[in-house]
Amino acid sequence: MINAKTKVIGLIGHPVEHSFSPIMHNAAFKDKGLNYVYVAFDVLPENLKYVIDGAKALGIVGFNVTIPHKIEIMKYLDEIDKDAQLIGAVNTIKIEDGKAIGYNTDGIGARMALEEEIGRVKDKNIVIYGAGGAARAVAFELAKDNNIIIANRTVEKAEALAKEIAEKLNKKFGEEVKFSGLDVDLDGVDIIINATPIGMYPNIDVEPIVKAEKLREDMVVMDLIYNPLETVLLKEAKKVNAKTINGLGMLIYQGAVAFKIWTGVEPNIEVMKNAIIDKITK
């Protein structure tokens, strides 16, 4: 029941109408008996500068941040957690005692989702497509104990991110951390991860980022997109019987970590998952 004491948490991005985060978080708040509500705010890039001051004025207690604001939002925050500083992107904000503090739960969320499906991810050869906020978080997390190739349409961005990861994590650039265009050679690659919006609702019938002929049965193909659950990339992967992982797990795990940051309470993962599955299957 929403009343005068209800605490508000928001999602800021553009667009946001495709998001399942409100469904997932509101189900988790209800399950834990917490007087919170989660609302999606469609924020145009030119209005981002007003968000934090506006939120403080209104008493909003936190946010998730999604495309395209994960990097740009950082300049408006009072403090940034060390992991988010390292990654150079923020996806979670807590506002407490007049301070807006930025965190990043994307990287750990992706790892948790991946390891839930295939076990410990260590010493693997991984290609990450994209060089934006989500790609940064996942790449920094997985580069700690795996070999990474950043593949991006704009090769200069891939190179810059690969160099930054190698430098910050003390990895060998050109060996442990590499870069490429989208036509990356997948020989010897164990896992590929799509961290671009290619294939995301409503543009679900686009050309996949990788075609089936470049994929193998012994690969793991993960797409961070969760709407649709089966993207064009995952359809291609199924043609060669590769292991596929959609973006639902990462959405839930990054959300669960954010939930704990805002409330101090561990959410019920199954409640979050079932709320989304109910929505998708209706």
UniProtKB/Swiss-Prot annotation:
Q: Which InterPro entries match?
A: Aminoacid_DH-like_N_sf, NAD(P)-bd_dom_sf, SDH_C, Shikimate_DH, Shikimate_DH-bd_N, Shikimate_DH_fam, Shikm_DH/Glu-tRNA_Rdtase
Tagged with keyword Glycoprotein: no
Q: Which superkingdom?
A: Archaea
Keyword Oxidoreductase belongs to the record? yes
Q: Which residues bind shikimate?
A: S19, F20, S21, T66, N91, D106, Y226
Q: What is its EC number?
A: 1.1.1.25
Q: Where is the active site?
A: K70 (proton acceptor)
Q: Where does NADP(+) bind?
A: 130-134, 152-157, 196, 200, 224, 247
Pfam families from the UniProt entry: SDH_C, Shikimate_DH, Shikimate_dh_N
Q: Name one GO biological process term.
A: shikimate metabolic process
Q: Report the function annotation for this chain.
A: Involved in the biosynthesis of the chorismate, which leads to the biosynthesis of aromatic amino acids. Catalyzes the reversible NADPH linked reduction of 3-dehydroshikimate (DHSA) to yield shikimate (SA).
Task: Give the record's family classification.
Answer: Belongs to the shikimate dehydrogenase family.
Cross-referenced HAMAP family, in alphabetical order? Answer: Shikimate_DH_AroE
Subunit-level organization: Homodimer.
Protein name listed in UniProt: Shikimate dehydrogenase (NADP(+))
Biological source species: Methanocaldococcus jannaschii (strain ATCC 43067 / DSM 2661 / JAL-1 / JCM 10045 / NBRC 100440) (Methanococcus jannaschii)
Q: What is the lineage of its organism?
A: Archaea, Methanobacteriati, Methanobacteriota, Methanomada group, Methanococci
